[in-house]
């Protein structure tokens, strides 16, 4: 795997200018997954001092030391935003299809869905928000955009007595990432049974190791005393297996590309598992969630990598609570990522013309 930067620990979704600066410091670059390189250890959070004084609403402090990100509404669903985002996705799907690329959406559910019993007193999803994930899936289905019910996938993991999110982190566990990679592989192969490339070019999976530390929500948003109260937790990550014949695979094009935020970064294992299951290289570009899904797609489509090689399948990872936020969602995305919907469409069309 020819990773241009080591795998990093992410910054959380940025709702404030300080978090935007932190996110830029921790941002990942375009990575090629499925060809070689070892998984690097996580980077220590670089914005701790800046963010400790942030509004406590950014993080919800639940029971038994559980922390929840606070950047999605627990009471209201932006139906108009869901409709508009789906319209933009449909435009992207059509333009990509005209260039021989199939667009699929990986919609990740909110952490709160799986640990409602750990939420603070008086904090809970309203009945309307409980139906939000299904509403987005139905909108994608009505638009003819392939996706799958990852909430159901992760509930199966949870029902097997495994955690799907870390207690003090916004991110998922390896068990959750692996299960989602399996469902994603099925989605890819259902639509494209014959992927280009050579059998045996997928990533070999290494052994798992554990490390004890604070989750990102604790590291970035709690004071030193508050962190001591919630405590560290054990992370399970998979080491990169030693590749065989590495030099032969370095330039092998990937038939599948994933674009998204820090949930799909290599540290948590999703792209490696997907590559292993598909038995093909998988390429990836990701940045922390404050950059937003709209800027991430453009980053890839406007890149030399896309111009040099168009994948057969583009998996666009999105997050349920932020699906309704469009390209111009001020206060949600990094200022550098903001643009009117019309500008986003213009850049999309320019990247995919010819």
Task: Pin down the residues of each PLM region.
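Extracellular glycan-modifying ectodomains
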Residues: 2-6, 14-29, 35, 39-354
